[in-house]
Design a protein with these regions (language model features):
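All-beta strand scaffolds that present successive hydrophobic residues in beta-strands
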Residues: 21-27, 47-53, 72-77, 83-93, ...
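Short, structured patches in soluble enzyme cores that scaffold and shape functional sites
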Residues: 10, 30, 42, 52-57, ...
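Extracellular beta-strand-rich solenoid/capping regions of secreted or surface-exposed proteins
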Residues: 1-25, 33-45, 65-72, 203, ...
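Glycine-rich, flexible loop segments associated with nucleotide phosphate handling
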Residues: 17-26, 45-48, 77-88, 133-143, ...
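Flexible, active-site-proximal loop/turn residues at the rims of small-molecule/cofactor binding pockets
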Residues: 12, 44, 69, 112, ...
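Acidic-residue sensor for enzyme active/binding pockets
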Residues: 30, 107, 234
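Short glycine/acidic-rich loop motifs that flank beta-strands on beta-rich extracellular proteins
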Residues: 1-4, 35-41, 59-65, 96-109, ...
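Juxtamembrane/interface motifs at transmembrane-helix termini
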Residues: 47, 70-72, 164, 186
């Protein structure tokens, strides 16, 4: 129950070398049937290049980047998550949370890392709908759980997970051309869990400063219960933009998408922009650049 496929926990203790980052690499590895697939935890596990990983059937997380709040090593290391400043490409995680705990396929607690062309799919959940909307458990069976800042996600996918597709809790992250598809998928849930419960995109109120460019939410199967919401956004969110987005559900059809395409739980703060299909909603009035002398425009 405690075996991981790969663990990095590098600490260059007080040596103050000219290059403080360990700069390890991890490439072209398949990992099946472990407690955790890959865990990158160390303060000096930085400057890494991680690519072409296939991780399947883990009891807990498939990929864990950084130490979560409450991790005993995090408490001993100045409450820092570690594992910052890394690059990930072509990561494929599926069938995580086989222990039916509260784990997501990919959990990110670090900062300033980049993820491209990566997928987290078919992760498990047996807890009911309430668990998806409680702070301590809402990442159960999710594709991606992001409790870090200043990260970038480019062309990544959450597909057919039993929980939410993307759960974005913290701010100043960027998402470009990413997909959330068929969350709370009926073939991935078990026990008290059901289809038609989760969101393809769940954006928490502390995700301020984040930008979502061309994100898609899609339930493509006419025969399958999948996500309840396309974009579920908590109240009091501020400084958050979703642009050129789309939310489709081929089972219920376009005329039944009210309250499901976009669902915001209450009032929003300043500088919020939501553009999903035909919806254009902003909590600010657009301003023009000011023309100054010599034909210069400033804003």
């Amino acid at each position: 129950d405690n075996v991981a496929g790969v663990i990095f926990h590098t600490r260059i203790a007080d040596a103050n070398p000219g290059e403080p980052d360990a700069v390890p690499t991890l490439s072209n590895i398949e990992i099946w049937d472990t407690a955790i697939g890959v865990a990158i935890l160390g303060l000096d596990d930085q400057g890494m290049k991680i690519d072409k990983l296939r991780i399947r059937q883990t009891l807990r997380q498939g990929l864990l980047v950084g130490k979560p709040v409450g991790h005993p090593l995090r408490a001993r290391e100045g409450d820092t998550p570690g594992a910052a400043d890394n690059k990930f490409s072509m990561i494929d995680v599926s069938d995580a949370n086989m222990s039916f705990g509260t784990y997501a396929g990919i959990e990110i607690y670090t900062s300033q890392s980049k993820f491209e062309a990566s997928t987290s799919w078919f992760n498990k959940r047996n807890q009911g709908k309430n668990a998806l909307y409680e702070v301590k458990t809402r990442h159960v069976g999710a594709g991606w759980f992001i409790q870090g800042t200043r990260n970038m996600f480019i062309g990544c996918t959450a597909q057919e997970n039993a929980g939410h597709g993307w759960l974005v809790e913290w701010g100043n992250n960027q998402f470009i051309g990413c997909l959330g598809e068929s969350s709370s998928f009926q073939d991935a849930v078990t026990g008290a869990a059901r289809g038609d419960e989760a969101a393809n995109w769940y954006i928490g109120r502390n995700a301020r400063g984040s930008r979502f460019v061309a994100p898609r939410s899609h339930n493509p199967y006419s025969w399958a219960k999948a996500s309840l919401y396309g974009f579920y956004i908590e109240n009091n969110i501020r400084d958050m933009h979703i642009t050129t987005a789309s939310a489709k559900d081929d089972r219920i059809g376009e005329n039944n998408m009210i309250g499901r395409r976009v669902h915001v739980t209450g009032a929003m703060g300043d500088n919020v922009l939501i553009e999903v299909d035909h919806i254009r909603h902003a909590t600010f009035a657009p301003k023009q650049l000011e023309k100054r002398g010599n034909g210069v425009f400033m804003g």
